[in-house]
Every structure is written in structure tokens, then in C-alpha cells.
Amino acid sequence: MKKKKTYGEVYALGQYISMSAPKARRVIDQIRGRSYEETLMLLALMPYRACDPILKLVNSAAANARHNMSFNEATLVISKAEVNEGTTVKKLKPRARGRSYPIRRPTCHIRIVLQDTSFDEFEEDFFSLKKDAWEKK
């Protein structure tokens, strides 16, 4: 299945982050739909361990937007943010009398998509002009 190319969006993907998916979703649900600057303040003040890798991903997505697409950081909004479960690393903890207990280390994949809101206004104007030209024929 081919992925649709969307203009005005950039993303950052973090794979195999050693954290369970529900713990990361708790933070992701708070930042979805917010502006970039508001997200930075929220993540700096939240008391969860998931905030650090998510903050790195948000900064990485903003750097992608600035460097690759020349977007302004003030107009960026987190349009999509999703957390998927990754592989589970299985280990054995040695115990007394030659026994062992299994230990599961869950991982997750986090994807942050930033959208430029100024591009939306341009896109609406552009497609409205294009539609009018089509109707005239």
C-alpha cells in the first residue's frame, strides 16, 4: 500500500523506545492537536518519564520542518501523534537454587507529525483559484 504524499507536513519517528505503549500514550494524548511552543512547555512540566523521548522527537520533527521544508516554528501544530507497540525484549533474571524468572522489557514506536498552519491557508487559496478556473471552462 502506497503512502499518500502530503504537503505541509513533516514527521519524526522514534523506534524501539524502551517504554510500554500505554505509558507513552498517556503523554501523547495530552499534546495531540496543540501548537509546537505549547507542547514544549507542557512536556517540560509534566512529571512522566515518557516526556523526555517525546520531547526529543518533537524537537527533531521541528528541526526537520525548519531545515528540510523551511517552515516557521511559530506556525507548527502537532496534527498527528501515534504510539504503536514494538517488540518485547525477553530476559531471564537469575534466582536462588538455579531457577530463573522471565523479565519482559516492552518497547514502543512513536510517530509525531507536525503541520504548518500557514500552508493550509495558502492551500485553500490555491485550490479555490484552481476550482474557479475549472468552472469557467
Curated annotation (Swiss-Prot):
Q: Which GO terms describe its molecular function?
A: rRNA binding; structural constituent of ribosome
Q: Which Gene3D superfamilies match?
A: Ribosomal protein L22/L17 (3.90.470.10)
Record-annotated membrane-spanning stretches: none
| InterPro entries given in the database record | Ribosomal_uL22, Ribosomal_uL22_bac/chlpt-type, Ribosomal_uL22_bac/org-type, Ribosomal_uL22_CS, Ribosomal_uL22_sf
Q: Does the keyword Lipid metabolism apply?
A: no
Q: Which PROSITE patterns match?
A: RIBOSOMAL_L22
Name the principal localization, coarsely classed.
Answer: plastid
CDD domains membership: Ribosomal_L22
Q: Origin, by domain of life? A: Eukaryota
What keywords sit in the KW lines? Answer: Chloroplast, Plastid, Ribonucleoprotein, Ribosomal protein, RNA-binding, rRNA-binding
Compartment list: Plastid, Chloroplast
The record's Gene Ontology biological-process terms are: translation
One Gene Ontology cellular component term attached to this UniProt record is: large ribosomal subunit
Query: What interactions and quaternary structure are annotated?
Result: Part of the 50S ribosomal subunit.
Q: Report the sequence similarity comment from the record.
A: Belongs to the universal ribosomal protein uL22 family.
Task performed by this protein: This protein binds specifically to 23S rRNA.
Q: Which PANTHER family match?
A: CHLOROPLAST 50S RIBOSOMAL PROTEIN L22-RELATED (PTHR13501), LARGE RIBOSOMAL SUBUNIT PROTEIN UL22M (PTHR13501:SF10)
This chain's protein is named Large ribosomal subunit protein uL22c
- What is the species of this protein? Oenothera argillicola (Appalachian evening primrose)
